[in-house]
Swiss-Prot record:
Keywords: Cell projection, cGMP biosynthesis, Cone-rod dystrophy, Congenital stationary night blindness, Disease variant, Disulfide bond, Endoplasmic reticulum, Glycoprotein, GTP-binding, Leber congenital amaurosis, Lyase, Membrane, Nucleotide-binding, Sensory transduction, Signal, Transmembrane, Transmembrane helix, Vision. GO terms for molecular function: ATP binding; GTP binding; guanylate cyclase activity; peptide receptor activity; protein homodimerization activity; protein kinase activity; protein-containing complex binding; signaling receptor activity. Residues 880-1010 form the Guanylate cyclase domain. Changing residue 734 to A: In LCA1; requires 2 nucleotide substitutions. Homodimer; requires homodimerization for guanylyl cyclase activity. Interacts with RD3; promotes the exit of GUCY2D from the endoplasmic reticulum and its trafficking to the photoreceptor outer segments. Interaction with RD3 negatively regulates guanylate cyclase activity. It comes from Homo sapiens (Human). Residues 1065-1103 are annotated as: Disordered. This is Retinal guanylyl cyclase 1.
Length: 1103
């Protein structure tokens, strides 16, 4: 592209470029002469007739940041271009097209994306990464391309650059000035884009004179990283406002969620600080309940968000970004399937930037008489343009103000509290008061000098106060010069015997725990000789850590541990001892036990007299005892993460002591205590210094106490009493062996302590513990061996040891709580699987129960009984009932064993149940050999009930013809069947074992039809015959004649003998002799052996 084309904003312009753009090179001019008339005609055409295309590039992190991508920049840019192309006022101008350009989230890639984007477009909206803003401005000015960098916090309107709205830095500064909050801190998300935004914003605020205390990044990107960032803010210089440079939680920003939850945990949302989101300045949030959907599920986040003031662009009261999106969708300018609730309000910002850039191009060309103009001219018209934005007017002197939103701690909606116009400097109330945490007021303002460009602010102090302070300091210095000696001694004495920092404790300060759990100002009962006989090295042993130990007391509400000095008579505490103890008390580290004071018992009465004349060091007490106690508790599972966490705590504690010039000298697992959070702390440090200052001789060491002692110290008792740094490293190695092997020092050597100490003191051979390579990482074992090297100079320093041990875990943090949480998570997962398995089994059993219940009762009735709903009786106008009975069942029962009768009925009714499954019938009940079925209830089926019962009866009769009893196959099984149709009432009777029963004369009549029937016959009443004939399905009935029915009199009844299309064989009814019963079996059909059994059961009946 030529230079003239670049000046034209990336488009070729015949007027600017001249013939060189239109014609071939000069040597080819003769070949072009025949076409000269056509060329002259083209040159005479007006520029608007060229139908040129102006391409607007939209550059942003659309591909690498999901929240930015939710703004749907493609739809926003195309919507703006489409509206401009349809604008009648721009007819004859260029056609606007858009190109969506991805900007990498990493800063180096962002710079490259800007360079490539400027080579492809005529105007550019972007970039978003502030690190690329200034390079983009310079490159755009060189290329002559108009630039609208909407995402840059601090952009100057010059050259080809034209900010779409007020830069974020100006808006934030105007807000801070309105409230007088000068001391601010910035917390950014760890991504490059936000880190660069924080740097650019802090630079802009500092350039305006504000004291930005810190710019902190959240790393790692979780709740712990948020806590660490806020701790830095809290522990740094005092601030009033915290600017959160990250995605807003209202748009789903997890970083801001973590930050606000951490602020709530740390108590920073109590009203002393105000939190200001940075990204909301770039788009328009509207008051209303939709904006707080992200807070609905977290009461902690709602409380924390009460400390947030949200500055955002203002839409007119009659609309919002969401309303504008709905109107565009209704006009079919946006896809109908687009979920508008999921579209970020950044949509409107992108639309406005594209629209403003394109209108600036159009107005610049119109002002130039239709000719193409430079990017600088386009930028000037953009700055002065007055155009309709997506939800309000843009540009010119009527720049839309900002609105300050707040919540009321309930989280149900956002309220507009103030309207802010940075250009005019106006800050007007919107009618709703701001709500601060706990109903308090806003943080107080900082000195006004911070916002006065003509005044130098000296840390926020007025010059008069500074002068008075100087005079006060000078006066105090002069007074101190005369009274230094006296005040020093008085203050030292008062500090040691009284006040919150006293170190001399008496029996009035310590409450000793009673051996049996009660509290008193006494020690445990026992002889003074037994207390004095305890070795100092045994003080931290396992039994002494229990609550019944006389060495445990309560001081200022906390349990403390008392370790006595050797000897029984200590008249006073020597000044050197006080000085040495004061230095030890100043040691503060999470892995070093805190020294609280020196206890001297004088004038004690009663059982407290046991401590009379005893001097003891009072230190904090840890509930889990010593490391030796913890390793002895086999019920506590110690994985490598657990062990490495304990060892890392130990290394950090020793490292701290060495940095402070303190050699422990007595380091062993009994002197390492573990608190309730499984944090290891070192105690008994500096004990040799205290003994030396108090001029007390230590007790002779026992061999059991010297297992951790370095060989050079064993050879020099004086050196052993003082201790050395290299000797602590050796002791560390022995403790590492204890933890790794979970055994006593040198336990695998099977030697007595005396033998071990002698061999360590006097090699060769070299005596060291034996540790298997599979008990810990190889690096740990190698470090252990380096630490117990024979030559002290070969042992690593504690700094080097710390670095080596950290590398064992590849830099991962080793925390016991994390290890325990992982174990709990495994247990929770196993429990969830077990619950899921049991739930599935329960659901399966429930299905079985439901299936069994629906087999016993109709489904509707069963469901009502399960829910406890009363089952009302139901009247059925027309049903057909079926009754059947086994002929001669009493005789068969007499000839059979009870189990054979049960098998007979089970086989027969299983056969019947299989048959009725293919018919629309309901099995009511079976009583003995009686079988009752109904159709037309509980589900009505019109007139089909008679046909269903008739078909079922024919199928049952056909199946009975081939049925044989297992125990008497030669005896035929005959049944009588009776059918009757009529009305009845159905309902559930009883609460215990409820039954679905039928009531009415129809039931009695059907039973009479069965009892008056004949074997292998289907006895049918006239009412049923009438329905069958009305159905006209070819049922074949024969008139039986007049039949006497009990309680009914004589009626005409019929036999059902078949149906058209029914081809199954039906058994032939037996011929009944005159006078014979239809309820029995003839003797000729009974086998002889069964007949004899029957005669025994009924003597004289068959003679």
């Amino acid at each position: 592209m030529t230079a003239c084309a670049r000046r034209a904003g990336g488009l070729p312009d015949p007027g600017l470029c001249g013939p060189a753009w239109w014609a071939p090179s000069l040597p080819r001019l003769p070949r072009a002469l025949p076409r000269l008339p056509l060329l002259l005609l083209l040159l005479l055409l007006q520029p608007p007739a060229l139908s040129a295309v102006f391409t607007v590039g939209v550059l942003g992190p659309w591909a690498c940041d999901p929240i930015f991508s939710r703004a749907r920049p493609d739809l926003a840019a195309r919507l703006a271009a489409a509206r401009l192309n349809r604008d009648p006022g721009l007819a004859g101008g260029p056609r606007f097209e858009v190109a969506l350009l991805p900007e990498p989230c990493r800063t180096p890639g962002s710079l490259g994306a800007v360079s490539s984007a400027l080579a492809r477009v005529s105007g550019l909206v972007g970039p978003v990464n502030p690190a690329a803003c200034r390079p983009a401005e310079l490159l755009a000015e060189e290329a002559g391309i108009a630039l609208v960098p909407w995402g840059c916090p601090w952009t100057q309107a010059e050259g080809t650059t034209a900010p779409a709205v007020t830069p974020a830095a100006d808006a934030l500064y105007a807000l801070l000035r309105a409230f007088g909050w000068a001391r601010v801190a910035l917390v950014t998300a760890p991504q490059d884009l936000w880190v660069e935004a924080g740097r650019s914003l802090s630079t802009a605020l500092r350039a305006r004179g504000l004291p930005v205390a810190s710019v902190t990044s959240m790393e790692p990107l979780d709740l712990s990283g948020a806590r660490e960032a806020l701790r830095k803010v809290r522990d740094g210089p005092r601030v009033t406002a915290v600017i959160m440079v990250m995605h807003s939680v209202l748009l789903g920003g997890e970083e801001q969620r973590y930050l606000l939850e951490a602020a709530e945990e740390l108590g920073l949302t109590d009203g002393s600080l105000v939190f200001l989101p940075f990204d909301t300045i770039h788009y328009a949030l509207s008051p209303g309940p939709e904006a707080l959907a992200a807070l609905a599920n977290s009461s902690q986040l709602r409380r924390a968000h009460d400390a947030v003031l949200t500055l955002t662009r203002h839409c007119p009261s009659e609309g919002s970004v969401l309303d504008s999106l709905r109107r565009a969708q209704e006009r079919r300018e946006l896809p109908s399937d687009l979920n508008l609730q999921q579209v970020s309000p950044l949509f409107g910002t992108i639309y406005d930037a594209v629209f403003l850039l394109a209108r600036g191009v159009a107005e610049a060309r119109a002002a130039a008489g239709g000719r193409w103009v430079s990017g600088a001219a386009v930028a000037r018209h953009i700055r002065d343009a007055q155009v309709p934005g997506f939800c309000g007017d843009l540009g010119g002197d009527e720049e839309p103000p900002f609105v300050l939103l707040d919540t009321d701690a309930a989280g149900d909606r956002l309220f507009a509290t103030y309207m802010l116009d940075p250009a005019r400097g106006s800050f007007l109330s919107a009618g709703t008061r701001m709500h601060f945490p706990r109903g308090g007021s806003a943080p107080g303002p900082d000195p006004s000098c911070w916002f006065d460009p003509n005044n130098i602010c000296g840390g926020g102090l007025e010059p008069g106060l500074v002068f008075l302070g100087f005079l006060l300091v000078v006066g105090m210095g002069l007074a101190g010069a005369f009274l230094a000696h006296y005040v020093r001694h008085r203050l030292l004495h008062m500090q040691m015997v009284s006040g919150p920092n006293k170190i001399i404790l008496t029996v009035d300060d310590i409450t000793f725990l009673h051996p049996h759990g009660g509290t008193s100002r006494k020690v445990a009962q026992g002889s003074r000789s037994s207390l004095g006989a305890r070795s100092m090295s045994d003080i931290r042993s396992g039994p002494s850590q229990h609550l019944d130990s006389p060495n445990i007391g309560v001081y200022e509400g906390d349990r403390v541990w008392l370790k006595k000095f050797p000897g029984d008579q200590h008249i006073a505490i020597r000044p050197a001892t006080k000085t040495a103890f004061s230095k030890l008390q100043e040691l503060r580290h999470e892995n070093v036990a805190l020294y609280l004071g020196l206890f001297l018992a004088r004038g004690a009465e009663g059982p407290a007299a046991l401590w009379e004349g005893n001097l003891a060091v009072v230190s904090e007490h840890c509930t889990r005892g010593s490391l030796q106690d913890l390793l002895a508790q086999r019920e506590i599972k110690l994985d490598w993460m657990f062990k490495s966490s304990l060892l890392l705590d130990l290394i950090k504690g020793i490292r701290y002591l060495h940095h402070r010039g303190v050699a422990h000298g007595r380091l062993k697992s009994r002197n390492c205590i573990v608190d309730g959070r499984f944090v290891l702390k070192i105690t008994d440090h500096g004990h040799g210094r205290l003994l030396e200052a108090q001029k007390v001789l230590p007790e002779p060491p026992r061999a059991e106490d010297q297992l951790w002692t370095a060989p050079e110290l064993l050879r020099d008792p004086a050196l052993e009493r003082r201790g050395t740094l290299a000797g602590d490293v050796f002791s560390l190695a022995i403790i590492m062996q204890e933890v790794v092997c979970r055994s006593a020092p040198y336990a695998m050597l099977e030697l007595t302590p005396e033998e071990v100490v002698q061999r360590v003191r006097s090699p060769p051979p070299l005596c060291r513990p034996l540790v298997s390579m599979d008990q810990a990482p190889v690096e740990c074992i190698l470090l252990m061996k380096q630490c117990w090297a024979e030559q002290p100079e070969l042992r690593p320093s504690m700094d080097h040891t710390f670095d080596l041990f950290k590398n064992i875990n590849k830099g991962r943090k080793t925390n016991i709580i994390d290890s325990m949480l992982r174990m709990l998570e495994q247990y929770s997962s196993n429990l969830e699987d077990l619950i899921r398995e049991r739930t599935e089994e329960l659901e399966l059993e429930k299905q079985k129960t439901d299936r069994l219940l629906t087999q016993m009762l109709p489904p509707s009735v069963a469901e009502a009984l399960k829910t406890g709903t009363p089952v009302e009786p139901e009247y059925f106008e027309q049903v057909t009932l079926y009754f059947s009975d086994i002929v001669g069942f009493t005789t068969i029962s007499a000839m059979s064993e009870p189990i054979e009768v049960v098998d007979l009925l089970n086989d027969l009714y299983t056969l019947f149940d299989a048959i009725i499954g293919s018919h629309d019938v309901y099995k009511v009940e079976t009583i003995g050999d009686a079988y009752m079925v109904a159709s037309g209830l509980p589900q009505r089926n019109g007139q089909r009930h008679a046909a269903e019962i008739a078909n079922m009866s024919l199928d049952i009769l056909s199946a009975v013809g081939t049925f044989r009893m297992r125990h008497m196959p030669e005896v035929p099984v005959r049944i009588r069947i009776g059918l009757h149709s009529g009305p009845c009432v159905a309902g559930v009777v009883g609460l215990t074992m409820p039954r679905y029963c039928l009531f009415g004369d129809t039931v009695n009549t059907a039973s009479r039809m069965e009892s008056t029937g004949l074997p292998y016959r289907i006895h049918v009443n006239l009412s049923t015959v009438g329905i069958l004939r009305a159905l006209d399905s070819g049922y074949q009935v024969e008139l039986r004649g007049r039949t006497e029915l009990k309680g009914k009199g004589a009626e005409d009844t019929f036999w059902l003998v078949g149906r058209r299309g029914f081809n199954k064989p039906i058994p032939k009814p037996p011929d009944l002799q005159p006078g014979s019963s239809n309820h029995g079996i003839s003797l000729q059909e009974i086998p002889p052996e069964r007949r004899r059994k029957l005669e025994k059961a009924r003597p004289g009946q068959f003679s």
